[in-house]
Amino acid sequence: MKLDNHLLYIDITQVCDIGCSFCMYTDKHSRENMILTQAARENLRNLINDEGVKRVSISGEGEPIYNLKVFKEILKLSGGGVAFEFITSGFVNHERLLKIYNEISEIILSNGDSCNIRLSSDSYHIDKIPNKPHGFSIQQFIKLNNEFMSLSFRSIDIDKEFTR
């Protein structure tokens, strides 16, 4: 199959403790993390490094921070020049979040890749997350000053005042 300007979307977990009322996956969560077999690694390596893949988006039908081991394994499959995206609520404490950002930065810099961290700013998540990651993440990305890592926010909310 020839890929052309393709988005490769990989769900790495079905574990989530947030329990958003809008979530279409809540009743389907198996509470399992993806495990990469050798065959899966080879298939993903081929897909990730295919010249027709524009971006590799890592998320979950849950919170992908619960499966960082596999996320880092996937990053390491790159042959270089891959644009990754990590979609998360960023619910962990700030110290752990900074450690995650630094680990991602180290891997992508060693491979010659880039990674955009997309933090949720859904009001459903904000109400349930004790460690608000948004302001902290903005500060850390300014300090990090890494041209290969970027930060963005995503929301399903239509309340523009909330997402400002």
State where each predicted segment sits:
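Conserved glycine-rich "GG(E/T)P / GGGxP" loop and the immediately following alpha-helix
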Residues: 2-13, 21-163
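Helical H-box/DHp helix segment flanking the catalytic phospho-acceptor histidine
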Residues: 17
